[in-house]
């Protein structure tokens, strides 16, 4: 029996089933697994996550998945906390101990930015509910209109930068999605974002390792 095209990494987080169902609703062949060989063989990989960065990184370390994820050349999509784990470090220090709990949590280091607390300018935290995004021309957002609504639940964010492929505003501007080469992440929950979320997942399902061959430019450079 052949492996599914898409592996959702079993990080032990609470939203695994909802992410899997979202892919199944669009007809994708997916499996939730922490098997290293299956992850390496997949056409594309999804890294979901809810909770704290420190607890999530400890889970990846305990499953011996960190080196595997960092070595992947196929499309990888981080969702919510999964997006944050693609960065260098996070200020979100709570949860289980992973390294020195008095310091920022070291993440996967695949996208050159850090996660900091969202400056909501007095608005309630977490930022929870529907909000509009401003997407770039990155293929993950093909067919997604300016001002489309997606569903967020978060208190930490990636700042705006060269890696930003979609923007949002909640007290301050922040990255609703980031990317570098084959690694992409969305701060919002596409599995809870109705038709817009389904479009984004379909776009991801069109990608393969060849989509990124020879592409080492920043997202903004590629869009110009």
Swiss-Prot record:
Subcellular location: Cytoplasm
Single Gene Ontology BP annotation: L-histidine biosynthetic process
One annotated Gene Ontology cellular component of this protein: cytoplasm
Catalytic residues (positions): 80, 189, 191
Glutamine amidotransferase type-1 domain mapped to chain residues: 5-214
GO molecular function, one term: glutaminase activity
Keyword Magnesium listed: no
Reaction(s) catalysed (UniProt annotation): 5-[(5-phospho-1-deoxy-D-ribulos-1-ylimino)methylamino]-1-(5-phospho-beta-D-ribosyl)imidazole-4-carboxamide + L-glutamine = D-erythro-1-(imidazol-4-yl)glycerol 3-phosphate + 5-amino-1-(5-phospho-beta-D-ribosyl)imidazole-4-carboxamide + L-glutamate + H(+); L-glutamine + H2O = L-glutamate + NH4(+)
Subcellular location, principal: cytoplasm
Taxonomic superkingdom: Bacteria
Record pathway: Amino-acid biosynthesis; L-histidine biosynthesis; L-histidine from 5-phospho-alpha-D-ribose 1-diphosphate: step 5/9
InterPro entries recorded: Class_I_gatase-like (IPR029062), GATASE (IPR017926), Imidazole-glycPsynth_HisH (IPR010139)
Record EC number: 4.3.2.10, 3.5.1.2
Keywords of the record: Amino-acid biosynthesis, Cytoplasm, Glutamine amidotransferase, Histidine biosynthesis, Hydrolase, Lyase
Entries under Gene3D superfamilies matching the protein: 3.40.50.880
Oligomeric and partner information: Heterodimer of HisH and HisF.
Function (record text): IGPS catalyzes the conversion of PRFAR and glutamine to IGP, AICAR and glutamate. The HisH subunit catalyzes the hydrolysis of glutamine to glutamate and ammonia as part of the synthesis of IGP and AICAR. The resulting ammonia molecule is channeled to the active site of HisF.
NCBIfam families assigned to the protein according to its UniProt record, in alphabetical order: IMP_synth_hisH (TIGR01855)
Protein name stated in the entry: Imidazole glycerol phosphate synthase subunit HisH
């Amino acid at each position: 029996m052949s492996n599914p095209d898409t592996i959702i990494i079993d990080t032990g987080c609470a939203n695994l089933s909802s992410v899997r169902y979202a892919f199944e609703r669009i007809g994708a062949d997916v499996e939730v697994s922490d098997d290293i060989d299956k992850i390496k063989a997949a056409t594309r990989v999804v890294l979901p996550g809810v909770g704290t960065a420190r607890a999530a990184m400890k889970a990846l370390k305990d499953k011996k998945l960190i080196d595997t994820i960092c070595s992947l050349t196929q499309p990888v999509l981080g969702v919510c906390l999964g997006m944050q784990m693609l960065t260098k470090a996070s200020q979100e220090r709570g949860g289980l101990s992973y390294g020195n709990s008095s310091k920022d949590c070291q993440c996967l280091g695949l996208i050159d930015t850090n996660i900091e607390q969202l400056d909501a300018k007095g608005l309630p935290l977490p930022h929870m509910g529907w909000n509009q995004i401003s997407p770039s021309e990155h293929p993950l957002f093909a067919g997604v209109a300016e001002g489309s609504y997606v569903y967020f639940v978060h208190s930490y964010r990636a700042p705006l930068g060269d890696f930003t492929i979609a923007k949002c505003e909640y007290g301050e501007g922040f990255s609703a999605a980031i990317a570098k080469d084959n690694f992409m992440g969305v701060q919002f929950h596409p599995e809870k974002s109705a038709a817009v979320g389904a479009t984004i997942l379909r776009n991801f399902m069109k990608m393969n390792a060849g989509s990124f061959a020879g592409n080492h430019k920043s997202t903004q450079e590629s869009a110009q």
